[in-house]
Amino acid sequence: MKLEFKKSISNKVIIILGAMFVFLFLLGYFLLVGIDKVSNVTPEMFFFSSYTVATQFGLMLFSFVIAFFINREYSNKNILFYKLIGENIYTFFYKKIAVLFLECFAFITLGLLIISLMYHDFSHFALLLFLFSAVILQYILIIGTISVLCPNILISIGVSIVYWMTSVILVAISNKTFGFIAPFEAGNTMYPRIERVLQSDNMTLGSNDVLFIILYLVSIIIINAIVLRFSKTRWIKMGL
């Protein structure tokens, strides 16, 4: 983990992530002021608008930095080095994922904390921290899995965008049939429920929605583990 943190700092990954989250929250605010012409932005509006940016544009925003953090090891031919220090495809991948998520979690917490302090409103802080973290974690896992399979960053980004567009189209066709593919998508049933919760005095989502999100993330992790299991040889070949 220490090695990956050092690489994140030396490769400016942590700086890029910080800039992305600043942009995400600022875009959430300016969409309300500039597009919706809202004169009095409430904390609920600000948070939900920022959440919308994260769910609708997050994959495009974060695909580069996530793919870069993994694919750079292929382009620099570093996989043999990882093998020599006792790493395998699982430790290689999950350490990188852990570092990316911890850094994102820190920026999410900081962003929500600053906004909550500005409005003196922490009523939905825990819920928002859970939702933003879940949304970003899915991006890290999905883009990370794609990046492990792809030989360079451009292909990883391209495949990730195709995946995102396909999931949006499928949910638009039928959120009952394909809703599990992209639970945070605006066309899905959970999206309006989250908006209602943020506009009310309820502090959290219903237990069914929370369980659904957890099962979704666990499913991605299981699929990822299966993909890694059958990619051991490919991982070594692409990094030599």
Swiss-Prot record:
UniProt keywords, alphabetically: Cell membrane, Membrane, Transmembrane, Transmembrane helix
List the induction conditions: Transcriptionally repressed by rok, this was not found to be the case in another study.
Q: Deletion: any effect? A: Up-regulates expression of the LiaRS two-component regulatory system; this effect is more pronounced on modified competence medium than on rich or sporulation medium.
Coarse class of the primary localization is membrane
Where is it located? Answer: Cell membrane
GO cellular component entries: plasma membrane
Note whether Transmembrane helix occurs among the keywords: yes
**UniProt topology in membrane:** Multi-pass membrane protein
Ranges annotated as spanning the membrane: 13-33, 50-70, 97-117, 126-146, 153-173, 210-230
Assembly, per entry = The complex is composed of 2 ATP-binding proteins (YydI), two transmembrane proteins (YydJ).
State the name under which the record lists this protein: Probable peptide export permease protein YydJ
- Please report the organism this UniProt entry assigns to the protein: Bacillus subtilis (strain 168)
Give the encoding gene's name. yydJ
